From Swiss-Prot:
Superkingdom: Bacteria
One cellular component (GO) term of this entry: cytosolic small ribosomal subunit
Keyword set includes Ribosomal protein: yes
Record field: compositional bias (Acidic residues): 250-263
Single GO term (MF): structural constituent of ribosome
Protein family according to the UniProt entry: Belongs to the universal ribosomal protein uS2 family.
Organism: Campylobacter jejuni subsp. jejuni serotype O:2 (strain ATCC 700819 / NCTC 11168)
Region (Disordered): 230-263
Basic and acidic residues: bias regions: 230-249
Gene3D superfamilies in the record: Glucose-6-phosphate isomerase like protein, domain 1 (3.40.50.10490), Helix hairpin bin (1.10.287.610)
GO BP annotations, alphabetical order: translation
Protein name per its UniProtKB record: Small ribosomal subunit protein uS2
């Protein structure tokens, strides 16, 4: 579990410039130095350890925790640590409705599965070069936006977010659906929007990596407890039909842009 030394070495205590702050974060601020707010690491440590246990217990109950972080400093760590603990993630861009309109998102994921099946069974080779190219392009777009959540069959039970200001749409959707939000809170964030806050820097790469690493460790610890109880996850695959293949091909050939569709 995280230590005070870890927090200091990763710069978790450095907040934003004093002119960029949310007054609701005042209770988490230790002081100010050279125009930068310094976060109270005693409180960070306490909240961190409490939240670690919350996340561990959620994983032990078999719950799905969605990792979200699309900015440059977060994308790599979000993907790396979500994969290390076998959880879904969004690190490219949050598409509006990813949780509130999850049925439509699942339909798009199904299209990805159809294209991959066509590649696997060789039916894509029966198409013209242009048709095959359009399907490949559609697959690349679907993978970029939805690859991290392709195995998420239902809405998540909890989300872990890096930068709640940038990911405000994801946080709003979670709040609307009453899905608990876990997140580091920098001095410009609104703590009222987060169920389990951890006051800390959400911009520095090392700080972001520490948060992601600790959440992954908590999840793996919880999963290990679940395995001891003999719980197992069964993943059922639905057979892909020729009709589905034709529908996806027709859509790809119409040159519909997935990213623009979901704005």
């Amino acid at each position: 579990m995280v230590s005070m030394r870890d927090l200091l070495e990763c710069g978790v205590h450095f907040g934003h410039q004093t002119r960029r702050w949310n007054p609701k974060m005042k209770k988490f601020i230790f002081g100010e130095r050279k125009g930068i707010y310094v976060i109270d690491l005693q409180k960070t440590l306490r909240y961190f350890r409490y939240t670690y246990n919350i996340v561990r217990d959620a994983a032990a109950e078999g719950k799905t925790i969605l990792f979200v972080g699309t900015k440059k400093q977060a994308g790599g760590a979000i993907k790396e640590y979500a994969e290390k603990c076998g959880m879904p993630y969004v690190n490219h861009r949050w598409l509006g409705g990813m949780m509130t309109n999850f049925g439509t998102i699942r339909q798009s994921i199904r299209k990805l599965e159809v294209i991959e099946k066509m590649e696997e069974d060789g039916s894509i080779k029966l198409l013209t070069k242009k048709e095959a190219l359009m399907l490949t392009r559609k697959k690349e777009k679907l993978l970029a936006y939805l690859g991290g959540i392709r195995y998420m069959k239902t809405q998540p039970d909890m989300i872990f977010v890096i930068d709640t200001v940038k990911e405000k749409i994801a946080v709003q959707e979670a709040n609307r659906l009453r899905i608990p939000v876990v997140a580091p809170l920098d001095t410009n964030c609104d703590p009222d929007l987060v169920t389990y806050p951890i006051p800390g820097n959400d911009d520095a790469i090392r700080s972001v990596q520490l948060f992601c690493q600790e959440m992954a460790e908590a999840i793996n610890e919880g999963k290990a407890l679940r395995e001891q109880d003999g719980e197992a996850l069964v993943n059922e695959e639905k057979e892909i039909t020729d009709e589905e293949k034709k529908e996806v091909l027709d859509e790809a050939m119409s040159e519909e842009d997935f990213g623009e569709e979901q704005e």
